[in-house]
Regions:
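Structural signal for short hydrophobic segments within the conserved structured cores
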Residues: 27-31, 206, 471
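Flexible, glycine- and charge-enriched loops at secondary-structure boundaries
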Residues: 43-51, 98, 321-324, 384
Length: 507
């Protein structure tokens, strides 16, 4: 039996899963780490935390599984996208990584549009300048920390920093590189034109691979730390959403998935390049060679529920600890006791600004309609419904582009909740299913690793062999019109408060 490793480098922690060649999860391990917010709207993490988490989880799964290291033929890494890792000439980290949800770079986005032109930028990178993307973060460092920028010799994404530490190779791949906003997305290579216009040295950037291509193998030092063999191959891997697409089998036209992780995503595969001229959704290279994907992103999906849990659900956390249960299960039970519409309470999930469809770094979250009658269960349901409505916003933009999914899969932590899946089915008005294996991104990069090692001839072939789908939850007919009424009001909240968000940001 051959085995493949999938490493999922997330915002809250890194999870490593060992799979056999048929897609069965043998063993997994998780290590969490903090997120730092030194100022309002800022978000940073320490790259060293990611690396140590990867080493610890790899060693843990190999030890617990008892699998011979020589049978682990390959591995792939999935990573939170857009984070900026800057290394000096010796490969040392120069500063904490500015990660995907950081919102400090509005001025740099304006600078990019002024120099390049918004339309030309979209034609090259398939996206407008956004605060979440790597390019604006790089310019922020150049503008505000010139001494750090002057020492920089390598720019990497989060997962690619871990790859470098495990292999010694400076490499990236097309799906994650698409989110740096320096890639020519239609042609799947770095844009020399864009880099020249912005005076960025191309030598700072790593070599670009396709996601299932082999980029190197485990170094001797990393083999000693992790317990892996030096013969273990490492493939390109993928950005977290592209990895989730592979891990849920969304690798052909007509297929889509919704992720409720820290962020929320509605993601659809397309064999033909499709770009939204308004820049409301993101078009990136897909982990399937020669294909692309279109995705709408909401900044604070699972993050909204985690924020509520950490600040208002201490009793549930304590009870769950005593019962040996996940506190989210107790929170779901409470939310289910509140009716659709949460007793006329709405929640806008703009805790970290918003991407799709508003592209507004200044908007902020709110409860609308709060009264003395409301209970914690109403607030919990409002949070879950508000996130669902924000995902509906994403789906609507895809529909405008002519991308109409026929099947929808749910993944991420929120996708494990039957209540949340039913909300998605009722609001999206389509069946929502899950895969038997819920390790979406980790399975996705493990599949890519299997293709890279020659266990399978192509990504679609590997998906057909390794992925199985559970029965879907269908829309409940009587629920649909109730959600439609609430959603209609939800869509007015942003426009009604857009000006106030700007005023708030100036305080």
């Amino acid at each position: 039996m051959k085995y493949v490793l999938g490493i999922d480098l997330g915002t809250s922690g890194t999870k490593t899963v060992l799979f056999d060649q048929y897609g069965t999860a043998v063993c997994s391990a998780l290590v969490e780490y903090p997120l730092y917010q030194p100022h309002n709207g800022w978000a940073e993490q320490k790259p060293e935390d990611w690396y140590h988490a990867a080493v610890d989880t790899i060693r843990s799964v190999l030890t617990k599984s008892g699998v011979d290291k020589k049978d682990v033929v390959s591995m792939g890494i999935s990573g939170q996208m857009h984070g900026l890792v800057m290394l000096d000439e010796a490969g040392n980290v120069l500063r904490p990584s500015i990660i995907w949800c950081d919102q400090r770079t509005a001025a740099e986005c304006d600078q990019i549009h002024e120099i390049v032109g918004r339309d030309q930028l979209i034609s090259i990178t398939a996206n407008p300048a956004l605060t979440g993307f790597t390019l604006s973060k790089l310019l922020w460092v150049r503008n505000h920390e010139p001494e750090v920028y002057a020492k920089c010799r390598h720019i990497l994404l989060p997962k690619d920093y871990v790859r470098y530490m495990l292999t010694g190779d400076f490499a990236t791949e097309v799906s994650d590189a698409s989110g740096m906003q320096m890639l020519d997305v239609p042609n799947r290579c770095w844009s020399e034109k864009l880099l020249n216009m912005l005076n960025i040295d191309p030598s700072l950037l790593a070599k670009v691979y396709e996601s299932c291509e082999v980029t190197g193998h485990i170094s001797k030092a990393a083999a000693e730390l992790t317990g892996l063999s030096e013969d273990t191959l490492v493939v390109g891997g993928a950005g977290d959403n592209a990895a989730a697409a592979v891990g849920t089998g969304v690798v052909e036209d007509g297929r889509a998935f919704t992720t409720i992780g820290t962020s929320g995503v509605v993601f659809a595969h397309t064999d033909k390049l499709a770009i939204d001229p308004k820049g409301r959704v993101h078009t990136f290279c897909c982990a399937v060679p020669g294909a692309w994907h279109v995705m709408g992103v909401t900044q604070a999906a699972g993050l909204s529920l985690k924020w509520f849990r950490d600040n208002f659900c201490m009793a549930e956390k304590e009870a769950a600890a005593l019962m040996g249960e996940d506190p989210y299960n107790l929170m779901n039970k409470q939310a289910a006791q509140s009716p659709i519409g949460a007793n006329k309470l709405l929640y806008a999930p703009y805790l970290m600004g918003e991407r799709t469809p508003h592209l507004d770094a200044d908007c902020r979250g709110m409860f609308f309609g709060l009264s003395a009658m409301h209970t914690r269960r109403d607030l919990l349901r409002a949070v879950m419904e508000g996130v669902t409505y924000s995902l509906k916003d994403c789906l609507n933009v895809l529909a405008e582009m002519g991308v109409a999914p026929e099947t929808m899969l749910a993944c991420g932590g929120g996708g494990k909740s039957p209540l949340w899946r039913q909300m998605l089915a009722d609001v999206f008005q389509m069946p929502v299913a899950t895969t038997v294996n819920t390790e979406g991104p980790a399975l996705g990069v493990a599949i890519l690793a299997g293709v890279g090692a020659g266990l399978y001839a192509s990504v679609p072939e590997a998906c057909r062999a390794m992925i199985h789908v559970n029965p879907a939850q269908n829309p409940i007919v009587e629920n649909v019109p109730q959600y439609e009424k609430v959603y209609a009001l939800y869509t007015k909240l942003y426009q009604a408060n857009k000006g106030l968000f700007k005023e708030l940001a100036k305080l």
